[in-house]
Amino acid sequence: MASTTNNTPIDTVILDIEGTVCPITFVKDTLFPYFIEKLPSILQKFQYPLPTTTTSDNDDDDDDDPVLNILKQLPENIIQSWESIFNHFKNLVDQDIKDPILKSLQGLIWKQGYENNELKAPIYQDSIKFIESFPTVKSKDNQRKIYIYSSGSIKAQILLFGHVKNSSTSTTSSSIDNDTIDLNDKLNGYFDITTVGFKNQSNSYIKILQEINKSQYPQSVLFLSDNINEVNAAINAGMKSYIVIRPGNSPINDEDKKFHKIIYSLDELDL
């Protein structure tokens, strides 16, 4: 395993979302249940069995419905009824399986929730402060950047950071209403499992380094996550990586605490 102790200055930070900048309970206790609650009424508006990609090639109307286009990616035996589709997705959610089709559909349904003001992202205040301030501090080449890497789709990431619940009066981000701000203009890019791969695989972080032109300077990149497997994967790709401990996160064993830097708030970062 590569060492995370290196004097190379950090000018790029990659943030995980749940359990790192956002309470892990928001995804499991708010976003997932919201998706399951809204799913039946969305599925029931279609006629079953759904057309497959092959049978609907000449139906231009099908292409106008983003939900239907996602559902048509499912195996034919699943799209015979709305109940079978619902059970399929509910099973994936219950088992916390990172399925790309599920993530795409969740992103669409969450979009409606954010736009209807039914959903707001409870980003930690220390994380809001860091995201707003880190890029504004000048480095030698003035290229300090923040990226997001999450198993949730990029669309879902943009929605989440675009509808952040804020209790501070000193924010520098654009306001949507009195208690909602948009942090997306502070972020330089987003990655998910469809663009670079799964978060517990080192090759995913190697791809990110290539995408952000940091392959030659991996130690100038810091990845923050609550997941030890993700932290190890990032370190093995050459990055620096710290474990973030937040209320409700899975416990970190003493052995891992010995060999990894631990932080409890992004306020602890001195970059």
UniProtKB/Swiss-Prot annotation:
Biological process, per Gene Ontology: L-methionine salvage from methylthioadenosine
Recorded metabolic or biological pathway in which this protein acts: Amino-acid biosynthesis; L-methionine biosynthesis via salvage pathway; L-methionine from S-methyl-5-thio-alpha-D-ribose 1-phosphate: step 3/6; Amino-acid biosynthesis; L-methionine biosynthesis via salvage pathway; L-methionine from S-methyl-5-thio-alpha-D-ribose 1-phosphate: step 4/6
UniProt keyword list: Amino-acid biosynthesis, Cytoplasm, Hydrolase, Magnesium, Metal-binding, Methionine biosynthesis, Nucleus
Listed GO MF terms: acireductone synthase activity; magnesium ion binding
One Pfam family this sequence matches: Hydrolase
Localization (cell): Cytoplasm; Nucleus
Binding site residues for substrate: S150, S151, K199
Broadest EC class assigned to this enzyme: hydrolase
SUPFAM superfamilies documented for this protein: HAD-like
InterPro entries membership: Enolase-ppase_E1 (IPR023943), ENOPH1_eukaryotes (IPR027511), HAD-like_sf (IPR036412), HAD_sf (IPR023214)
Catalyzed reaction equations: 5-methylsulfanyl-2,3-dioxopentyl phosphate + H2O = 1,2-dihydroxy-5-(methylsulfanyl)pent-1-en-3-one + phosphate
Cofactor binding, per record: Binds 1 Mg(2+) ion per subunit.
Co-factor requirement: Mg(2+)
Residues annotated to bind Mg(2+): D16, E18, D226
GO cellular component, one term: nucleus
EC number of the protein: 3.1.3.77
Highest taxon, organism lineage: Eukaryota
HAMAP family (alphabetical): Salvage_MtnC_euk (MF_03117)
Oligomeric form and interacting partners: Monomer.
Family of the protein in this entry: Belongs to the HAD-like hydrolase superfamily. MasA/MtnC family.
Name of the protein: Enolase-phosphatase E1
Species lineage: Eukaryota, Fungi, Dikarya, Ascomycota, Saccharomycotina
